[in-house]
Amino acid sequence: MKPIVSILLFCALAVVIMGHPMNQGYGIPHDVVKLPNGQWCKTPGDDCSKSSECCKAKDTVTYSSGCSQEWSGQLGGFVKLCHICNVESSMC
């Protein structure tokens, strides 16, 4: 029983640390608009340098959007990605 609990705990911890590839909120409805500089806003999961580059959620009361640093295991460092998440979520 102890090994099973240890394995489950390890798996849960790995998911929390590494995240899921689609956890930036791509499935949440968002508006793709043209920015003042002529470029299109960046969708969730795209690289960004500031929050104003990222597409906003259609429901701005329930969802928040922005540019945040996340750990990339593939690159071995932090990257800034656009995301959309639920305002009430502790991960937002």
UniProtKB/Swiss-Prot annotation:
Keywords: Disulfide bond, Ion channel impairing toxin, Knottin, Neurotoxin, Secreted, Signal, Toxin. Expressed by the venom gland. Pfam families: Cys_Knot_tox. Disulfide bonds join 41-55, 48-67, 54-82, 85-92. The presence of a 'disulfide through disulfide knot' structurally defines this protein as a knottin. The keyword rRNA processing does not apply. Belongs to the neurotoxin 21 family. It comes from Trittame loki (Brush-footed trapdoor spider). This is Toxin ICK-16. GO terms for cellular component: extracellular region. Residues 1-19 form the signal peptide.
